[in-house]
Amino acid sequence: MRSVLRIVRESLILGFAEMSAVYTWRTWTFGWLVRLLCQATFYALLGRYVGDGATMRYVLVGNIVVLACLEATIVVISLAGERRIGTLPLLAITPSGHLPVYLGRGLQWTVTGLTSSLVAWCVLPPVLGVPLPWPRAAYAAPVILLILASSYGYGCALAGVALRTRGVEWLVLNLAYGIVMTFGGVNVPVTVWPAPLRIAVNVLPVVHGLQAVRGILDGAPPGHVLRLLGAEALVGAGWYAVAALSMERLVSAGRRDGSLGHAG
């Protein structure tokens, strides 16, 4: 456990050092964060235009919560970058084992994702005139954290595709996030989709967690909310298992044939 905590700590230090080469706190706050707030605002106003106040709240809540997924899946870029700059083999030979190091490579995005979603949760509803039932709405915070964790596992699993097929990391990232945003109940209920698609989206992160957030806001029974949280946790665990298997096979194959080398 101590070694895992050390890896988490050092991964965060490395991740934020990497981010500091791109962002200052000002450019992150007034550039990236404002961009995310504008994105959520755009969809909320679009919901108001095509519907009513209830539609606007539905869309706003969905787009605030999904920001956590957006940032968590950026781990795809972080992991693909290790291959591009030639450091992937070094991660594979770490004394603590390659899996914790790989899974920790993008942890900084979980911190920024949680920050972005919570800032949006507190700022956008009053600014846009969308009332939330405070203090009950505060219970959404730990649910967003769970969604963030399951989305990070989803991103780690899909990073395996980007590590095997060089140059596709941005395509993988945008498809991963776009699929969740389109079919995961963010802007329209999952029930609008055909039955086979409704079944398929249950394996995506966000779907059950977002339903739990909506249930909290609507005063749903605690048992109903807890079942949804359990489903979200199960989905996240499944994606972490896929990520672990994918990375194990990647490293095993790379050790045999030397394919972990520099991307060129």
Describe these PLM feature segments.
Residues M1-G264:
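Hydrophobic transmembrane alpha-helices and immediately adjacent juxtamembrane helices
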